[in-house]
Amino acid sequence: MFIDNKKKGKVGQVLKQHLEPNSKLSIISSYFTIYGFKELSQELKKIDSINLLLTDANITQDISILYGEIEDTKYKNLLDQKKIAKECYEWLSQKAKIRQLDSKTNFTFSTYNIENKDNNNLAIQGNSNFSTTGLGVTATNSLFMNTAVTDFESTKDLLNNFNEIWNNKTIVKD
């Protein structure tokens, strides 16, 4: 399935449809925003765990992206940033393992892998970061091209690829 966050489906909606209680989620994304979390928080609170690999080498020096993108003005105007940040922090503390890609390694796309007990798995690969624009919630002029697969063999292959990167200590750090 092709997902463009406009006419051909939205990454956030596809994730919501596949996230189940006790799902295991594995994500590679340049960054992660609290407003992206807010949009999926109902589903994310029910999952078992998340492995989150951030690929933007500058994220440790400049964490401002955590508080949203330029398109997130409507969220910032609600003045509930502190509440959302606290909720996100608590959720990450309970459910997440977070690692970062080494700054010398270039990774130019994002992946989302959902493992469910009933093998109703999903994998999405493309250029949608974990943000409101990347999830297709907030309108943007950016172009997104993502592919979602649900067949067992493809989801297994993409998850295996994620795990190879996740466990590679030469390019990934805690």
For each of these PLM feature ranges, what is it?
Residues 1-174:
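PLD/PLD-like phosphodiesterase catalytic module centered on the HKD motif
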